[in-house]
């Protein structure tokens, strides 16, 4: 640009650039698309009636839609697996730790802890939340009488009909949110439980309830908004998708049934003027005379052959079954993938079909799903398992004080590992990590859900047995460089 153009350009009117957010448009189309948007708080948006309505629809979809049932059940099975195993770390008192771990494992099997965790995971997906009460069972034939018991969300409700909190502290925290009482700092203090489920035959006729201290109640739910106190169903965004899937499947089946029930269709290609005035009707409304032979078809039979004789100008044809079979499969797969995205579940797991997958694509899809499972396992360990272990430990220490020599200890929960789609690649990577010293045997075993101490003890027994029986040592017993097997291309 020349100097003269720059000088002249200063005196010319400048063109304004108009920019805006399309999402903030107030056009009729945008208002229709976002007609459900509001500024409600988390508790107001997730009121009791809203939560119960969504939960009831999610449960209905779960028991009537095989894909919804399979997705949620698979999610719970993959999350819990065979159940978490307690691992205690601390000083040198390994034998004492081992005895405690065995007692807890035995107690967990007796109270069906794994079943409780799977039920809790399903409840979070369908209902949005669940409650676990740490109560005692004096009649239980075991040393520790503690027995956690799970309750549906409807058990914890307010005695009033108010949908939103009526009282607040000066700090802004609510006094009660639908059966959960809080202090001025937002900590739950008490839970109000109905004696009977509100949906049971006598639940609506009773007003009996119990107040449980917060120390004895575990609240596990789906929380994603600031200030949210009650959980909302994880399936809420996918309910319409599952419903569309059922409706479309039903429509395709009905279309096929209609086509199968119609044996033939009779039609004619006569001009309209030939059909006018060709029928005379008597005083009783009965056909008296016809100019054209439009009587019904006459059936003929000759031996094993059957046929029809049609009136003049008429023809017959079979109804073509034109159900969208190819479109149905594509539509179904798209809906399943869309619904499973709520749980970060890959399509092949949700649909139970990996025909379109190879090792590379399967591994990439599963990485996201496995991260989701790891995050959920960590939440279960923090919210549920640590609380249960703390309560169990109080009873166990009273009877086995000798197994609690040190207070400087910690614990973690070991879960089932994830199987690799290519075992050779994973074994090579594991061997290189161990050889380079960037990992430990404990970490590698933890990835597979195994205890490295159990493996070392088994190795010691195998070495001793080989020496006693005069057998040559196994390949892994010889000190050598790690063997890396050749990898195959995908």
What are these regions (language model features)?
Residues 112, 342-344, 449, 470:
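Glycine-centered helix-boundary capping/hinge motifs
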Residues 2-14, 353, 363-364, 379-413, ...:
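C-terminal anchoring/interaction modules
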Residues 63-223, 433:
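Structured, mid-chain assembly/scaffold modules that mediate subunit interfaces
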Residues 1-86:
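N-terminal-proximal low-complexity accessory segments that begin disordered
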Residues 85-86, 90-102, 307-425:
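Surface-exposed loop-to-helix/strand elements on domain peripheries
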Residues 131-153, 271-296, 387-418, 478-490:
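Charge-rich, acidic-biased intrinsically disordered regions
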Residues 217-364, 483-484:
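Extended, charged amphipathic alpha-helical segments
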Residues 119-123, 134-136, 256-264, 350-354, ...:
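Short coil/turn segments at secondary-structure boundaries
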């Amino acid at each position: 640009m020349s100097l003269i153009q720059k000088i002249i350009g200063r005196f010319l009117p400048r063109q304004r650039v108009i920019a805006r957010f399309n999402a903030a448009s107030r056009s009729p189309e945008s208002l229709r698309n976002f007609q459900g948007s509001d500024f409600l708080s988390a508790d107001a948006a997730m009121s009791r009636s809203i939560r119960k309505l969504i939960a009831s629809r999610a449960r209905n979809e779960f028991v009537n839609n095989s894909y919804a049932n399979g997705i949620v059940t698979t999610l719970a099975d993959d999350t819990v697996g065979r159940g978490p195993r307690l691992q205690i770390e601390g000083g040198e008192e390994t034998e004492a730790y081992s005895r405690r771990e065995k007692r807890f494992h035995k107690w967990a099997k007796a109270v069906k802890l794994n079943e409780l965790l799977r039920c809790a995971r399903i409840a979070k997906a369908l209902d949005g939340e669940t409650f676990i009460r740490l109560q005692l069972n004096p009649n239980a034939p075991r040393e520790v009488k503690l027995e956690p018991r799970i309750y549906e969300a409807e058990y914890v409700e307010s005695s009033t009909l108010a949908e939103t909190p009526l009282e607040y502290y000066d700090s802004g925290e609510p006094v009660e949110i639908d059966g959960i009482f809080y202090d001025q700092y937002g900590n739950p203090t008490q839970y109000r439980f109905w004696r009977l489920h509100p949906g049971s035959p006598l639940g609506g006729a009773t007003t009996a309830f119990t107040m449980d201290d917060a120390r004895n109640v575990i609240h596990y739910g789906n929380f994603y908004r600031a200030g949210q106190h009650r959980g909302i169903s994880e399936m809420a965004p996918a309910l319409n998708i599952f419903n569309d899937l059922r409706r479309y499947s039903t429509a395709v089946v009905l279309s096929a049934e209609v086509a199968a029930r119609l044996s033939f269709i009779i039609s004619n290609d006569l001009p309209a003027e030939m059909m006018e005035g060709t029928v005379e009707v008597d005083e009783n409304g009965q056909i008296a005379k016809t100019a054209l032979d439009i009587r019904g078809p006459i059936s003929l039979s000759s031996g094993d052959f059957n046929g029809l004789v049609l009136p003049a100008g008429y023809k017959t044809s079979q109804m073509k079954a034109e159900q969208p079979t190819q479109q149905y499969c594509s539509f179904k797969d798209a809906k399943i993938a869309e619904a499973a995205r709520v749980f970060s579940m890959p399509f092949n797991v949700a649909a139970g079909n990996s025909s379109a997958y190879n090792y590379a694509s399967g591994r990439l899809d599963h990485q996201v799903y496995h991260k989701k499972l790891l995050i959920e396992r960590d939440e279960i360990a923090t919210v549920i398992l640590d609380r249960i272990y703390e309560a169990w430990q109080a009873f166990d220490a009273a009877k086995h004080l000798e197994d609690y020599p040190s207070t400087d200890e910690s614990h973690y929960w070991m879960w089932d590992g994830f199987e690799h789609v290519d075992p050779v690649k994973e074994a090579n990577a594991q061997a290189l990590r161990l050889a380079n010293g960037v990992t430990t045997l404990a970490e590698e075993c933890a990835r597979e859900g195994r205890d490295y101490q159990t493996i070392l003890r088994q190795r010691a027994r195998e070495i001793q047995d080989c020496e006693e029986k005069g057998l040559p040592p196994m390949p892994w017993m010889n000190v050598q460089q790690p063997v890396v097997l050749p990898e195959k291309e995908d």
